Regions:
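Acyl-donor (CoA/ACP) binding surface of acyl/acetyltransferases
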Residues: 1-25, 56-232
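Conserved GNAT-fold acetyl-CoA-binding loop/helix
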Residues: 26-46, 228-233
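Short loop/turn motifs at secondary-structure junctions and domain boundaries
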Residues: 47-52
Length: 233
């Protein structure tokens, strides 16, 4: 059985349970690691968890039961985002990719206007970074010092996304290489300032160098999601 999502009523029957979840758990990778009861009640009563732009669901796991909540954000935009919160006692069990895969399917199946689904996390949230990759999402941006940290220096905010066409076809549209301004007249694209562009492939004493090709993306993604590689990234 798959992970399912139950619509949540923050202003009614589910208010107390939502406030309890927010205040009884630590959220070390969110902007506010600890949420006080007055803060939670103010946000819930102010519509932060259910309005035109937000919709919230309980996360129902077939083995563990209700494990947390997920809030869809920017629903009036063709690229919504999400806020995933799993209760502390269910973390570290590898549930993230299951949840995100099921959530992606729900969004694309029930929201025909959505063309891409996006999420962001801070650079030190290794479990969430792994979750994105294992769910087949593609890294699109790395915003340096873009994530405010309560009482500390800002960290980078890392953005991942899933395209509807990739979800539907089971393929991956890679992010293109950096594209700068066209090279000056008389110099080939890719050439160093003081010389000509190398002739690819470029043999060396021990190996042959060549640019990445589009068909390299699959094995590169697999390599960079291996635990022994991820911990050094």
């Amino acid at each position: 059985m798959d992970v399912t999502f139950t619509p949540l009523d923050p202003a009614g029957a589910d208010r107390d349970a939502l406030v309890a979840l927010l205040t009884e758990n630590a959220w070390p990778f969110h902007t506010r690691p600890r949420v006080t009861r007055p803060e939670a009640e103010k946000a819930v009563d102010g519509g932060a968890w259910e309005d035109e732009d937000h919709r919230t669901f309980w996360i129902e796991h077939p083995e563990h039961g209700r494990v947390g909540v997920v809030r869809l954000e920017d629903l009036t935009d063709p690229t919504p985002l999400f806020d995933l919160r799993v209760a502390e006692r269910f973390r570290g069990r590898g549930l993230g990719a299951q949840i995100l895969t099921a959530l992606t399917r729900r969004v694309f199946e029930t929201m025909p206007a959505v063309d891409r689904f996006e999420g962001q996390t801070r650079e030190d949230n290794v479990p969430m970074l792994r979750t994105f990759r294992r769910a087949g999402w593609v890294k699109e941006a790395h915003y340096r010092r873009g994530w405010p940290v309560d009482g500390g220096e800002p960290l980078a905010s890392v953005a991942y996304a899933m395209l509807r066409q990739d979800w539907a076809s089971g393929t991956t549209t890679p992010v293109p290489a950096d594209v700068d301004a066209p090279p000056p007249a008389g110099r080939k694209e890719g050439a160093a300032a003081g010389g000509r562009a190398p002739d690819w492939p470029l043999p060396t004493a021990r190996l042959t160098l060549r640019p990445h090709r589009e068909d390299d993306f699959g094995w590169l993604q697999e390599m960079y999601t291996q635990p022994e590689v991820v911990r050094h990234l």
